[in-house]
Amino acid sequence: MTTRRSRTATDTYHHGNLRQALLDHAVELARTGGPDAVVLRDVQRMAGVSNSAAYRHYSDRGALLGAVTEYAESRLADAMVARLNAVPEKGTKAKRAVDRLRATGQGYIDFALAEPGLFRTAFAHTETGRDTHDRREIAKSEVGEHHPFQILMRTIDDLVAAGVLSPDRRDGLDEAAWAAVHGLSTLFIDGPLSEADAQRKQLITDRLLDAIAVGLR
């Protein structure tokens, strides 16, 4: 009589699937617990594979967390682009440019509220060894056009092209706008504004975006 061998988790991974499976498990840990929850040994256990098998794909926790950070950044960018794509193609060029900037900020805050664990992980660069001192260079050289900061930069470039923002006031606005929406996002998920209800949070968001828009002129 032939005994049928049960399939183990290790049996199911082949042709490079293990790397993606490890990343998927790590993303789920980050989603529920933020960057501190991403531990290579835990991910290896979830996948049901040996330490050596996991280390062939991610040499240490920093490598795994770096991959999750890139994933989280990409999802944040997706949320911003979704808001941008919803901006109606009507009104003056100047109005559309301002509306697109507001949409970018709204998408950023939307993501923080919907995915706080991934949002925190998107900024865990110090734990991965990635340099974060110059976000402009990171956006241009490491991850290309689909990066949250690059998306923000383009919407601000559109403001200059539309005549809303004078070129001599362009420098530094990327970082200022980013600081504003990131700061509010952090207050919403980790700070004293975390207890505010959804309606109150949206009101505060609207006021912040109003202030940014007024400051452009």
Give the positions of each predicted feature.
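Amphipathic C-terminal alpha-helical segment
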Residues: F111, R154, D158, W178-A196, ...
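Base-recognition residues in the alpha-helical recognition helix of bacterial helix-turn-helix
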Residues: Y55-S59
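Append "Primarily bacterial transcriptional regulators
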Residues: R41-M46, A54
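Alpha-helical structural segments
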Residues: N17, A21-E28, T32, M46, ...
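Amphipathic alpha-helical packing segments from all-alpha helical-bundle domains
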Residues: K95, D131-V164, D171-E175, L203-V214
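N-terminal intrinsically disordered/low-complexity leader segments
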Residues: M1-N17, V87-A94
